[in-house]
Amino acid sequence: MNLEQIYKDRGAYLEGHFLLSSGKHSQFYLQSAKVLEDPKLAAKLCDELAKIIASYKIEFDSICSPALGGILAGYELARACNKRFIFTERVNKEMTLRRGFEVKKGKKFIICEDIITTGGSALESAKTIESLGGIVVGFAALANRGFCGVENLKSPRKDNAKLPENLPLFTLGNFEFEIYDETNCPLCKKGSKAIKPGSRGN
């Protein structure tokens, strides 16, 4: 499966000057919503991700995603795994569980995103689940931007990764783009202004 080509074919591999949800800047942005708007393609991708997770024989009861970006990927992965699905959402800058969703003590969760950059939002969701008595056993995403180590791809973890080292991350592929702090962003230095297509604060 050529994940990069799928994103390009769907107009989801964008070039410009972007402010990522992590606060970093990048010349490239992956707009997974353009991929996941096709139900058949979403099902195909998440069926493949479910097979990868199943091959590691990890036991879990539910999948949880951070809103908004992770919801479609998480729901489709839950369907493919025949598991329950819930999502966390940001209220007053705090990741919370609402809408009557419950976490029973000792139940095991995989946290699913569409794209993992440093893993900040996924980690916030994991901490929310754990604060309510759940146990997070792993993370999953359609793609990793090259910072967090990926179990099934055997890709190494970089220093700015926020996901815990002791839990696996499963993805369909890696996209390795340069990202920059605002203070040393070459696009900013050329006078360009970053736009924010992502999830936080929108």
From Swiss-Prot:
GO molecular function: magnesium ion binding; orotate phosphoribosyltransferase activity
Gene symbol of the encoding locus: pyrE
Pathway the protein takes part in: Pyrimidine metabolism; UMP biosynthesis via de novo pathway; UMP from orotate: step 1/2
HAMAP family: PyrE (MF_01208)
Annotated orotate binding sites: 117, 145
Classification via Gene3D superfamilies: 3.40.50.2020
Cofactor: Mg(2+)
NCBIfam families assigned: pyrE_Therm (TIGR01367)
Species of origin: Campylobacter jejuni subsp. doylei (strain ATCC BAA-1458 / RM4099 / 269.97)
SUPFAM superfamilies documented for this protein: PRTase-like
Name of the protein in its database record: Orotate phosphoribosyltransferase
Description of how the protein assembles with itself and partners: Homodimer.
GO BP term, example: pyrimidine nucleobase biosynthetic process
UniProtKB keywords: Glycosyltransferase, Magnesium, Pyrimidine biosynthesis, Transferase
Reactions performed catalytically: orotidine 5'-phosphate + diphosphate = orotate + 5-phospho-alpha-D-ribose 1-diphosphate
